[in-house]
Amino acid sequence: MSSNSSQAPPNGTPGPFDGPQWPYQAPQSTYVGVAVLMGTVVACASVVNGLVIVVSICYKKLRSPLNYILVNLAVADLLVTLCGSSVSLSNNINGFFVFGRRMCELEGFMVSLTGIVGLWSLAILALERYVVVCKPLGDFQFQRRHAVSGCAFTWGWALLWSAPPLLGWSSYVPEGLRTSCGPNWYTGGSNNNSYILSLFVTCFVLPLSLILFSYTNLLLTLRAAAAQQKEADTTQRAEREVTRMVIVMVMAFLLCWLPYSTFALVVATHKGIIIQPVLASLPSYFSKTATVYNPIIYVFMNKQFQSCLLEMLCCGYQPQRTGKASPGTPGPHADVTAAGLRNKVMPAHPV
């Protein structure tokens, strides 16, 4: 089936808003499988992102400026879950987009808006760590107003690039299995292709470049600190931990957004390309699963957040800690520079 089938259903095939798309697009079992996946994503993402927001509200010590962008990411991911994954769940149960064309446009807009906020939050997070750790601005003090500005930028930038399809520059249409909506990669033409190419550059290439630049310089800074203290085990351990953490962060970003961006670019620039509906749906579902692993990678690995979460879940009781220092909680004689750099990469303390 051609990639533009969402726009022109074959004779005898119900429209995406008219009735079940099985067996025309895929077997009914495929829709059931996707519904199970989306149900799992909705349940898990709602819990983990909700916990991030609630714990951050309840514990003042978590509300340091460097943590604002993490809460911003959790809010964006929760909205993606509510506006995108939950709608997709209902539609896949029914086999078509049951809410109609207007809701399709609204869902496409909201998922694009909050998705762009999420991916740019990861880029701003990397930039903030670079500024704090590498000090390119000298004795710069990262404060609340800087954190708020970073969060505001993600929403303003996302609105700038998610609103045009509502105003005539491209459009939001059913995609893949026709149970979710997104930008019109399929139809072609200068109107759609110019938007897709602009979106690819501004909402994938730019944030990815910023992430790679920031984390590369951060690792070089930490490596230089480790080289000056070759005998300090804590320094060497911090370098290894941060290196692993950065690799996980970058790979998670690519896993989430590379399939979606590549698919959009290929379809937009190759007219008449043949892509099966199931394959066309995969990139969208990859991006939605990020709402589960983003908070796990960026927040739940935070030692101080773990402590506050356990305290909240245990109704104020703090589990006994062993005397052995964990990787995230260096002992009293640990190297201050290494621990400081590590904590600022995955912040646990106010700066």
Swiss-Prot record:
One of the record's GO cellular component terms: lamellar body membrane
Domain of life: Eukaryota
Tissue-level expression: Pineal gland.
GO molecular function: G protein-coupled photoreceptor activity
Annotated S-S bridges: 104-181
Keyword Lipoprotein attached: yes
Intracellular or extracellular location(s): Membrane
PROSITE patterns, sorted: G_PROTEIN_RECEP_F1_1, G_PROTEIN_RECEP_F1_2, OPSIN
PANTHER family assigned: OPSIN
Protein name: Pinopsin
Source organism of the structure: Gallus gallus
